[in-house]
Amino acid sequence: MAPGCKTELRSVTNGQSNQPSNEGDAIKVFVRIRPPAERSGSADGEQNLCLSVLSSTSLRLHSNPEPKTFTFDHVADVDTTQESVFATVAKSIVESCMSGYNGTIFAYGQTGSGKTFTMMGPSESDNFSHNLRGVIPRSFEYLFSLIDREKEKAGAGKSFLCKCSFIEIYNEQIYDLLDSASAGLYLREHIKKGVFVVGAVEQVVTSAAEAYQVLSGGWRNRRVASTSMNRESSRSHAVFTITIESMEKSNEIVNIRTSLLNLVDLAGSERQKDTHAEGMRLKEAGNINRSLSCLGQVITALVDVGNGKQRHVCYRDSKLTFLLRDSLGGNAKTAIIANVHPGSRCFGETLSTLNFAQRAKLIKNKAVVNEDTQGNVSQLQAEVKRLKEQLAELASGQTPPESFLTRDKKKTNYMEYFQEAMLFFKKSEQEKKSLIEKVTQLEDLTLKKEKFIQSNKMIVKFREDQIIRLEKLHKESRGGFLPEEQDRLLSELRNEIQTLREQIEHHPRVAKYAMENHSLREENRRLRLLEPVKRAQEMDAQTIAKLEKAFSEISGMEKSDKNQQGFSPKAQKEPCLFANTEKLKAQLLQIQTELNNSKQEYEEFKELTRKRQLELESELQSLQKANLNLENLLEATKACKRQEVSQLNKIHAETLKIITTPTKAYQLHSRPVPKLSPEMGSFGSLYTQNSSILDNDILNEPVPPEMNEQAFEAISEELRTVQEQMSALQAKLDEEEHKNLKLQQHVDKLEHHSTQMQELFSSERIDWTKQQEELLSQLNVLEKQLQETQTKNDFLKSEVHDLRVVLHSADKELSSVKLEYSSFKTNQEKEFNKLSERHMHVQLQLDNLRLENEKLLESKACLQDSYDNLQEIMKFEIDQLSRNLQNFKKENETLKSDLNNLMELLEAEKERNNKLSLQFEEDKENSSKEILKVLEAVRQEKQKETAKCEQQMAKVQKLEESLLATEKVISSLEKSRDSDKKVVADLMNQIQELRTSVCEKTETIDTLKQELKDINCKYNSALVDREESRVLIKKQEVDILDLKETLRLRILSEDIERDMLCEDLAHATEQLNMLTEASKKHSGLLQSAQEELTKKEALIQELQHKLNQKKEEVEQKKNEYNFKMRQLEHVMDSAAEDPQSPKTPPHFQTHLAKLLETQEQEIEDGRASKTSLEHLVTKLNEDREVKNAEILRMKEQLREMENLRLESQQLIEKNWLLQGQLDDIKRQKENSDQNHPDNQQLKNEQEESIKERLAKSKIVEEMLKMKADLEEVQSALYNKEMECLRMTDEVERTQTLESKAFQEKEQLRSKLEEMYEERERTSQEMEMLRKQVECLAEENGKLVGHQNLHQKIQYVVRLKKENVRLAEETEKLRAENVFLKEKKRSES
């Protein structure tokens, strides 16, 4: 922002303080180029600058191929002072905070770009009193100076409260810097407050010094570390917040304005290759860069939204953006100080910072005054009326602005929509989480199922491979198994066992049950958190509160009825009380029914969940037993397979033996082969006789191949048939084992279930016995209550009879009417007294108004005194400024004296140099050319120093000229002050004269107004009295008729209620009898149920015994089967050993068929027994369900009994209420018998009213005369009001003059601050010059010290060598730098 635009901006903010800002909505961006540090000049790369400032609003970045230009609100170069930065950036925001707007100032830039210096100042010294202090201390000073000014202007009518909080965001965690012991804090959002930090300490401050103490105390707790780019680098974002609350009172109306001033020091963005960060520093840098990138994303999104695009602004991605949400596109006036490093080494970070600042400049905030108006209702109504009149006046000239109500409605609608959206978002998040959990569970299930399928496939493959391998071995090998093959078979069997174990572990049913268990637990938790349960609890609390409130109201009404004596108020209150009690009873009944329903639902749900849990537990135990059985089966299968392998080995060996031995089923050469038939018995004997003769021939004769092949084929066919039979039997056996396993699981499940049911039944028995005892006790109590109610009913009947006798007396009605008339007369007298009291009250109000007028005059005098005080303060400040100027002059004089001393030193040095030059001229012939060159270089340096001294002298002259200019300005200000004093004195004299005249005329007006008011009051009171008397007479007549009707209706209603109560009592007794009978029936049913349960338990035990028997039978059958298999093996062995023939014996097949038939019969018997057991189990389950239904029905009946008991209690309470009402009616009747009014008094009062009318007509005539006088007074008043308006205009003019003077004073103060900063800068430069002069003096001393010519030559040569060496080193370093740059380019 240009300096010339400062005053314009301030005027805009002042003019828009009481309405939403329009022009100042855009974020103000201020770019500051880092001031040079002491060590910056020595660093390589900083000598080449990449920035140049074109004007106060634009800068140029020297980029390739073309330079880029950026324009901002203000651009500060290297020589800009801290005061100018504060004046352009912070002043306007602090002023807007004073007028009720929120304000934010934050510094942005890379690490080491001067953010902390800009916001705080130098870190070495005390920032609050230092001339180079930053924006935060200066904003404290300016804020509290504005507060003091407002307090002086408003006096006691305006008060301020300032609170400070200081937090930091470190590694995306919020910490309170004012409380070092605090842990991580949290951000919350409020409709009115906005985003705020929960639990942050707020300290009240009353001055700038206290605020700075709070800041420095928190700053010491901030996390700071050193990096290669910065000695003290901020490792966190610091946010210092000042809450300003101003309260202004005017005519009992309180205007409260609250505003927030956020002063933010952001941590700088950094690159790891530049800072060389490692470990914790690297993590900190990552978190800093992440939060700053979120800030950049938010700004780009806000720019897109401003351009009309629909984008989501991700405030919640970072704690920093969420905290500064109102500052970025919200309710705040924001200024950004973009700090930039001018060195070419930081070109990338500088470019990104400038781009960020350019985007931020496009954001527009919507700042609104945070104001709340409170006060008396009458005062607020008057204010509203005044504002409406102003609006009507404005409407005649221009269109009215948009109403605030529509805005508020829009805001409220927006907030409602936002809350709904947030609720939907939370619900969707919860649903999403639950769905993700379900998906993960389903994925686990699918994985387990896939594993199960794979394991099954592997088992099938293993078995097929094993069968194929055994067949091959059987066909190919002639001997036993090799050891390698046996090992391989064992390994394969082990693999198969492992797959079976994995199959058991990843069984899908187990996973499914686990998932169902998890889902049921979640459902249980969800149902516990259901709204009906919570609502029932809330309804209980509400009903208790309502009942207590109703009881307190009824007791209060009864006390008031006892204290009062009249009949009419009781007659009005009693029906109201009756209606209220009826309503409360109805509400009670509804609430109790709802409670009972909710409790019933909750109990049912509990029972269902318990049953479900029991079933799941039983299933789990059955599955565990099934797993054990499977493991046993695995071990059995292992043993069976080992036996089968050994048997196959034996069979193979025997078959080989049979094949290799020679047979006797053929004859050699031409001998026929004998057939094995039953007809060959005789031939067999002959054959056996000649067998000894033929043995030698058979043994010596070779076996023909055809016979070998036939024998082999026969054996192979027989083996196949046997194998097929074996496989079929094995399949049947597997099926039977699988069925047995299922039966075993089912039996285990039933056993576990039966144990659980036994436990349940035992617990329910105990509960039923307890309930039975409770019911019996309740029945006894109810019987006692019934007896009590019967006695009370008899008592009530006697009372009702007495009341009927009393009610028949009609003469008492006349006495009640007379009583009412007398009460009317007393009321009329009371009202007359009230009117007189009102009259007195009005007079007191008039006196109070006079006192207020006097107070206003006193306040005007106080204002005059405050104005005088302000003038004195102005004088004091001008004196202080003049003293400061004098001090400044003295300091300038001291500087001049220092300069003179320096000049004298320079002259002395010149003289020394002249002497040296004369010596060198004498020794010119002997000296070399090199020494002359060195001397010339020394002379050039001296000339440079002299030129610098001359520049300093020129600067000093400029400072003197600026001092003269400031003195002229001060003299002109003094002259203007004197002229203003004269004008103010004249104005004050005129004001005093006008005050005296106004006071005199106001007194006359007040007296006239009072007389007029008195007359009006009298006239109005007379008219009101007359009308009220008429209305009262009519009301009394109507009330008498109403009372008669109400009495008649009351009697009828009481008769009806009495009859209803009798019927209710009879019904209650019947219900009690029914309940007793029902309880007896229930006890009988319970006993029968217990007996049935015992029977069922006996049945279950019998079934268990049968199951055990069946198990034993199955085991016996297994043993028989094994025995028969052994017999089969024995038969096979005998067939193999028999040398008669290669074929099987004829009885083998028949024996096998018989065995198979017996096995089939046994299997069918097992199936029949299984079906019978299943039928028995289903019957038992049905019986159990029937018993459960009966138990539930009995519970419902018990609940109905409890409801009946509650209804009987309610009837008793009704009886008590009716008895109380009857007592009230008796008392009213007794009171009505005592008083009798007189009708004659009405006539007397009417005559008095006629007389009053005549008197009032006379008063009206006098009033007309007074009105004419009043009009004259009003015209005079109008003239005085015009004079008052002129006076107010003059006061406003004086206020504008005062504000101008304040602004000029602030400008002078800022100029003085700038001059102080320049003075410090010049002093630093002077110190640098002194050091350089001292260095030159030392060098000269060295040169002077070397008087010997040979020593001088050696010294010069040494210097030359050092210079050459340094030049070579610099060239090497430059070459290495160029090489590294080229290497980086080639790598990129």
UniProtKB/Swiss-Prot annotation:
Modified residues (N6-acetyllysine): 1009
Keywords: Acetylation, ATP-binding, Coiled coil, Cytoplasm, Cytoskeleton, Microtubule, Motor protein, Nucleotide-binding, Phosphoprotein
InterPro entries: HMMR_C (IPR031794), KIF15/KIN-12 (IPR044986), Kinesin_motor_dom (IPR001752), Kinesin_motor_dom_sf (IPR036961), P-loop_NTPase (IPR027417)
Cellular compartment(s): Cytoplasm; Cytoplasm, Cytoskeleton, Spindle
Modification sites for Phosphoserine: 568, 1141, 1169
Polar residues biased stretches: 10-22
GO cellular component, one term: spindle pole
SMART domains named among the record's database cross-references: KISc (SM00129)
Tissue-by-tissue expression: Expressed in testis, colon, thymus and in breast cancer.
Pfam families: HMMR_C, Kinesin
Binding-site positions, ATP: 109-116
Coiled coil location: 368-1388
Residue ranges annotated for the Kinesin motor domain, each copy included: 26-363
Phosphothreonine modified-residue sites: 399
GO biological processes: centrosome separation; microtubule-based movement; mitotic cell cycle; mitotic spindle assembly
Region of interest called Disordered, as start-end residue ranges on this chain: 1-25, 1228-1250
A GO molecular-function descriptor: plus-end-directed microtubule motor activity
Predominant location: cytoplasm
Disease: Braddock-Carey syndrome 2: An autosomal recessive disease characterized by microcephaly, congenital thrombocytopenia, and facial dysmorphisms including Pierre-Robin sequence.
The protein's assembly and partners: Interacts with MKI67 and TPX2.
Function according to Swiss-Prot or TrEMBL: Plus-end directed kinesin-like motor enzyme involved in mitotic spindle assembly.
Record family assignment: Belongs to the TRAFAC class myosin-kinesin ATPase superfamily. Kinesin family. KLP2 subfamily.
Protein name: Kinesin-like protein KIF15
